[in-house]
């Protein structure tokens, strides 16, 4: 079985092939999300605590959280479910997935290091992979650099160098939820437009009601005139 071990603190990942069934026995009958001590896996993992995050069987079917079964099952999946990406709006499909219980017929088991042990693991805990992109949302940038609301966030955006041919230039992400005088002015203009439209609708409704009352009054007078003429003709 292959173990895909990740260390989120450093952003590193490493694959290890283990053929000895006795070393893997500690993972059997465990569920996704459970923590397992790594002492029995090998001496280099002494003191480590792993968290089971997923896996695939020999045919490539992924493990699905919440399915309490050690084998494959067929589930009707829709948008929002893991292990399925709908191609059309509202599409559902019955797909084969593995349960969340670890069994012997898995080919890959994904683990995450929760607690580091005594020894360093080469290529996993002794190196650090820097994040490629910085925060994008305005509040996240403020939190990242410890800024106040008075500071201009645009000066602190993490830029990255891009080389295209002979040219080297920097790129910065578009800051999301950035509050500027221009956005506030747009918000005020939109609010004023809504108020103006509502007032126009009220004026139009009042004008229509006035016109309708006038037409009803004219029709009432016409009917009264017709009745009066009819009564006079009957008398004569």
UniProtKB/Swiss-Prot annotation:
Keyword field: Cytoplasm, Ribonucleoprotein, Ribosomal protein
Chief location: cytoplasm
Superkingdom of origin: Eukaryota
GO biological process terms held by the UniProt record: translation
Subcellular location: Cytoplasm
GO function term, MF aspect, one: structural constituent of ribosome
One GO cellular component term noted in the UniProt record for this chain: cytoplasm
Pfam hit, one: Ribosomal_S6e
Function: Component of the ribosome, a large ribonucleoprotein complex responsible for the synthesis of proteins in the cell. The small ribosomal subunit (SSU) binds messenger RNAs (mRNAs) and translates the encoded message by selecting cognate aminoacyl-transfer RNA (tRNA) molecules. The large subunit (LSU) contains the ribosomal catalytic site termed the peptidyl transferase center (PTC), which catalyzes the formation of peptide bonds, thereby polymerizing the amino acids delivered by tRNAs into a polypeptide chain.
Quaternary structure (record): Component of the small ribosomal subunit. Mature ribosomes consist of a small (40S) and a large (60S) subunit. The 40S subunit contains about 32 different proteins and 1 molecule of RNA (18S). The 60S subunit contains 45 different proteins and 3 molecules of RNA (25S, 5.8S and 5S).
Annotated family: Belongs to the eukaryotic ribosomal protein eS6 family.
PANTHER family in the cross-refs: 40S RIBOSOMAL PROTEIN S6 (PTHR11502)
Name by which UniProt lists this protein: Small ribosomal subunit protein eS6
Organism of origin: Candida albicans (strain SC5314 / ATCC MYA-2876) (Yeast)
Originating gene: RPS6A
């Amino acid at each position: 079985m292959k173990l895909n071990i990740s260390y989120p603190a450093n952003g590193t990942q490493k694959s290890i092939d283990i053929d000895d069934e006795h070393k893997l026995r500690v993972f059997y009958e465990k569920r996704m999300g459970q923590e397992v001590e790594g002492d029995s896996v090998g001496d280099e993992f002494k003191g480590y605590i792993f968290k089971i995050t997923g896996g695939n069987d020999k045919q490539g079917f992924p493990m699905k959280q919440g399915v309490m079964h050690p084998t494959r099952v067929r589930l009707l999946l829709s948008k929002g479910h893991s292990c399925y990406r709908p191609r059309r709006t509202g599409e559902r499909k019955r797909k084969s997935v593995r349960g969340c219980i670890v069994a012997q017929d898995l080919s890959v088991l994904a683990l995450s290091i929760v607690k580091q042990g005594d020894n360093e693991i080469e290529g996993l805990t002794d190196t650090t992979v820097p994040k490629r992109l910085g925060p994008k949302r305005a509040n996240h940038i403020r939190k990242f650099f410890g800024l106040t609301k008075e500071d201009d966030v645009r000066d602190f955006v993490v830029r990255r160098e891009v080389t295209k041919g002979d040219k080297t230039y920097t790129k910065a992400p578009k800051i999301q939820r950035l509050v500027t005088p221009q956005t506030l002015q747009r918000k005020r203009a939109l609010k004023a437009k809504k108020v103006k439209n509502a007032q126009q609708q009220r004026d139009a409704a009042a004008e229509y009601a006035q016109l309708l009352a006038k037409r009803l009054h004219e029709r009432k007078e016409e009917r009264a005139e017709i009745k009066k003429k009819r009564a006079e003709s009957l008398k004569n």
